[in-house]
Swiss-Prot record:
Keyword NAD listed: yes
Name of protein: NADH-quinone oxidoreductase subunit A
Family affiliation: Belongs to the complex I subunit 3 family.
UniProt xrefs under InterPro entries: NAD(P)H_OxRDtase_bac/plastid (IPR023043), NADH_UbQ/plastoQ_OxRdtase_su3 (IPR000440), NDAH_ubi_oxred_su3_sf (IPR038430)
Listed EC numbers: 7.1.1.-
Cellular compartment(s): Cell membrane
Source domain of life: Bacteria
Reaction(s) this enzyme catalyzes, per UniProt: a quinone + NADH + 5 H(+)(in) = a quinol + NAD(+) + 4 H(+)(out)
GO molecular function: NADH dehydrogenase (ubiquinone) activity; NADH:ubiquinone reductase (non-electrogenic) activity; quinone binding
UniProt organism field: Buchnera aphidicola subsp. Acyrthosiphon pisum (strain APS)
Task performed by this protein: NDH-1 shuttles electrons from NADH, via FMN and iron-sulfur (Fe-S) centers, to quinones in the respiratory chain. The immediate electron acceptor for the enzyme in this species is believed to be ubiquinone. Couples the redox reaction to proton translocation (for every two electrons transferred, four hydrogen ions are translocated across the cytoplasmic membrane), and thus conserves the redox energy in a proton gradient.
């Protein structure tokens, strides 16, 4: 049984890179723990905002709608990334790739219509929550 030395060398160099990278991270964490100070006081536990002493409560509470909009943005941003990757390789994918991208776009449009229908993108609180899904 012959062993391909080129493949072994490639894997060996990759695993050496991973080992030394993790070792360097571990070394820096241990060094900061050894050399770092361990004093704690009332002022060390207060938030620091560019040298300005904070006045009042520094905890900010956001509405859940902000997080919903952020999640919707991430979903449709990932869609744009997938469609960009498809558009780069459009010659290689042919009609099958086009039909897959079309089905992907249609499913995301249906998801967007669903979000509009359940009023997930509605910011006004005056509208009653009478949601009819079908």
């Amino acid at each position: 049984m012959l062993i391909n030395t080129e493949a072994v060398n490639e894997y060996l160099s990759f695993f050496m890179f991973i080992f030394f990278s993790l070792g360097l991270c571990f070394f820096m964490l241990c060094l900061s723990w050894i050399l770092g100070g361990r004093s704690s006081s009332r002022y060390k536990n207060t938030p620091f905002e560019s040298g300005i002493v904070s006045s009042g409560n520094t905890n900010l509470y956001f509405s859940v709608k902000f997080y919903l909009i952020a999640m919707f943005f991430v979903v449709f941003d990932v869609e744009a990334l997938y469609l960009y990757a498809w558009s780069v390789s459009i010659k290689e994918s042919g009609w099958i790739g086009f039909s897959e991208a079309l089905m992907f776009g249609i499913s995301l449009l249906l998801g967007l219509f669903y979000l509009v229908r359940i009023r997930a993108l509605n910011w006004s609180s005056s509208v009653k929550n009478n949601i009819q899904l079908f």
